[in-house]
């Protein structure tokens, strides 16, 4: 190479690394991050909305929400607890004195 023309020649430097022929790692990372964000969004949606919606829909089918919370056991409605009248009040019973029964 002529020293006078050396200023006009640039060294040959590759502009990009050769591809390995597989899926680029940036694409794998992108899919992993988007999947993780979608999973978190679905979980928060379940916590804030879907869980209450499921309880409301099941309660409309004739089961109370208490029955749903304490399990899927059927309640025995054939022998309900009777409504008993309250015992008669005795008026003002007075101050509490320990040991007097």
Curated annotation (Swiss-Prot):
Q: What domain of life? A: Viruses
Any GO CC annotation of this UniProt entry: host cell membrane
Q: Does the keyword Transmembrane apply?
A: yes
Per the record, the major location class is host cell
Question: What protein does this entry describe?
Answer: Movement protein
* Gene Ontology process terms (BP): transport of virus in host, cell to cell
Q: What membrane topology does the annotation report for this chain? A: Single-pass membrane protein
The entry's function note states: Involved in the viral transport within, and between cells.
**Compartment list:** Host membrane
Q: What residue ranges are annotated as transmembrane?
A: 30-50
Query: So what family is this one in?
Result: Belongs to the mastrevirus movement protein family.
Q: Please provide the record's keywords in A-Z order.
A: Host membrane, Membrane, Transmembrane, Transmembrane helix, Transport, Viral movement protein
